[in-house]
Amino acid sequence: MPTPSTKKKVKKVAEDPLSSSGVSSLSGISSYNIRKISIYKNGDRYHRGVKFVINPRVIKDMEPLLNQVNDRIELSHGAKKLYTTDGKIVNSIKELEDGKIYVAASAQFIPMRYGEFAEKVWKPPSRKHSPIMSSDRIKTARTRSQDPSKRRQPQNSGSSAPTGSGVQRSRSVRTLAEDRKSRRDANPARPNVNGASNAPKKFDGARPKAPPARQTIPKPKKILTTSTTNKKPPTPKRKVSKKVLGAAAAAGVTVVGAAAIGAVAAAKRSTPKPIPTAVSDVSTASSIPIPNVTGAAEILEFPEEEKKIDMATIHRTPTPPVVASRPATAKAPGTPANRSATALEAKSVSQQPTPESSEEEEDEGNGDEDDDEEVEDDEEDAGSDEAEEEPSDEEEEDEETEEEEEEEEEEEEDDDESRVETPASRKSSSAVSFSGSTEEDHKKGDEAKK
């Protein structure tokens, strides 16, 4: 009988059967039927795969194997099935073959070429064979950047033997710094007008800040004022008939000015007509009509210029000049009695101080048409008549000639209506100046020559 010392002691394997040490210890025993397999992840062609060693004495069912696979391979719903590369399901451990590839899946198998593509390992590119960082190119960059006197000969030339072995470090950064320094040495600082040299610019300094933006205050818009805003509203005209003036003279009322004429006209008429709005502004020298801005049809009035008579000059003269009577017309031949009556009437008219009261009366046959004739009544300027300047002699003569022409036209109209005239209705000239009498004397001389 063999002694206990000669008996071969068999060690019990207490290690993990799936570990590499367990495989090495059990590799010599053929009776155990140990198998080595590789399991890949379903749907991942670049998966490296996990190697498993299956001992049928330890692992007798598929459930512990799937638990080990689930711990090593991460799937969305866990490792629930094993497939062959052809897509067949492995139902038991006995179907597993040694050295084969299997795929762990959750539900459905995805056919791919598993195990042929290993996962790529990304590494930085080598500078040894790249065309940009080749040694020849670096040498040309160094020689071009330096001055001819400071150029170095390449190390691989025949004159100098290689001093060291191995891959040399790139000197591109140093080349740029030397290039800038050589440029600065080659171009010295130019002196100023005063003789001081400018300090060289520092390339490493901080970037200068931009100047702050100026705050611009918006200018107020200019409002264009129209010329009509500053003007006073035009004074309305009041229509005064010459018949009213005659009635006032017959009643013994002395008409003194334009305001008095307006008052008499207002008393005479109970319902005055509406005041016109578009009336030209009356100035001391001349009257300028306002243009029609609205574009509507409008009749522009050109009233006669107002005659301003200085009251002081009238009171200084002892006797007013006597105006000669008008010569008789062909339509209404005058008698000596009529001529004397007109002379008396002219004297009475010339003694009146204002030019407005010198307007003559008209026949009653004119009716309502005579009431429509207008006399300008400027109430604002009535009080300042004496302060205004007298018009020139030439303007007075032009005004008098225009008035005489208008009176002659009125006489012709009256003669057509009624041939018979009375001394009261006889027309007389409203001119008080000397120019009117001279024109009448010329007319008389022409008739006498004829």
Swiss-Prot record:
Keyword Cell cycle tagged: no
Q: Which SMART domains match?
A: DCX
Which stretches of sequence are listed as region Disordered?
1-24, 123-241, 308-450
Q: Where is the major localization of this protein? A: membrane
Tissue specificity, per the record, is: Expressed in amphid and phasmid ciliated neurons.
For bias kind Basic residues, which ranges apply? 1-11
A GO cellular component term found in this entry reads: axonemal microtubule
- Fetch the Pfam families from UniProt: DCX (PF03607)
Per its record, how is this protein called by name?
Protein rpi-1
Q: Which organism is it from?
A: Caenorhabditis elegans
Q: Which gene encodes it?
A: rpi-1
